[in-house]
Amino acid sequence: DKYSSLEFWNDFSGKEKIRFLYILYSFYEIMKNKLPNFLVVGAAKSGTSSLHEYLIQHEDIFMPTINKEGKSVKEPQFLIKSKVEERLHFGIWNWDEYKFLFENVKQEKAIGESTVFYLYYYKEAIKNIKLRLGNDVKIIILLRNPVDRAFSAFQHVSKSVKESLSFEDALNQENGRLEQDLTLTPMVMYKDMGLYYDMVKAYKEEFDNVHVILYEDFRDKSDKVLKGVFEFLEVNIKTKINSSTRHNV
């Protein structure tokens, strides 16, 4: 009855009540707003940029392209804000700004975003995915041979962020490197980002729908892989995608 319900509520501490109301509000936001029902979480330098660009072409899929200021955006980073905000010069750090990314959703069935560090910072990402987006989000993971992935990441950092070490020295000095320099991009964890087992295991344990793609399959049989992705997202598998261009590999 209403009295026992009131007594039950009064058994909670103040902090517990606040947390309960916050979770309730978060689920209300999920229902009210057009928010992602799938995420491309990584790994970095494993074909995620190409997949993102191909998904944008599908009429049943919405991926954000601009932020509130009209600037181009691909990787919001929002769900791992506490891990990367100090290190990265790009990202969406505010909940209202994150929601704005999806304001132009119309009739698209699949709504998603791509942030490659969601795989590496899987504990933080999973916690916030569940809190902000719910438990039914579909997860897409691309994996590449760890050695090839590491060297590709090194080349990327050397070109865009000016890596100060040789590849060999960077591998030897990797332990503790992020802690020693708070301005470094997480991309410099060349070896650590290729230790996929715990990352993938955690996502598979926490979410019912996880789709894993091998980079080599995506590179060599992109049409077949894309069809598998479309089936996973439950969108039209016959849509023609221009997959001739490879992006940022």
Predicted segments, located by residue:
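PAPS-dependent sulfotransferase catalytic core
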Residues: 1-121, 132-137, 146-180
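The conserved 3'-phosphoadenosine-5'-phosphosulfate
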Residues: 70, 74, 201-249
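Hydrophobic/aromatic beta-strand patches that form the interior of the parallel beta-sheet core
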Residues: 112, 138-140, 211-213
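Canonical radical SAM enzyme core domain
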Residues: 144-147, 218-220
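Glycine/proline-rich, positively charged
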Residues: 170-173, 194, 198-201
